[in-house]
């Protein structure tokens, strides 16, 4: 498939992990039907404090009841965000915990360290559950024709004139 720009229109915020500034953005509702947001990498960073690539780790730490993902019991949004800002991935968090001079043990409370130690399996499994797989074996090809090749301009213009769609008629002429 040639590289193309993709806008995912979804109310499921899990799709934000697919955002990348090269080609993928997510269009979603913010509040109500008229307040919308188009997320690129910067917008994801502004909302969460880290990039879209860390959203599965965030979900692995804090869980997500709406998706029945457990996470680490006792770890909420704020702590999960700070852990990701400091260590990035769940793998890095647990790698640090196993070192002799753990940065985590000196930067976070003993309670957080204990929760992470007890919740390691839940964190790792929750991350797996919260990750959208990108390796599904699919085949896709773009059609050979462009969409405008099938438009019968005379019929479209007659309809637009009948319905008094002047601007739409002009836009159609410009697009075909």
Regions found by a protein language model. Give the residues of each.
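Extended two-metal-dependent nuclease catalytic cores across DNA- and RNA-processing enzymes
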Residues: 1-137, 170
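Low-complexity, acidic/Ser/Thr- and charged residue-rich accessory regions of DNA metabolism proteins
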Residues: 115-118, 128-176
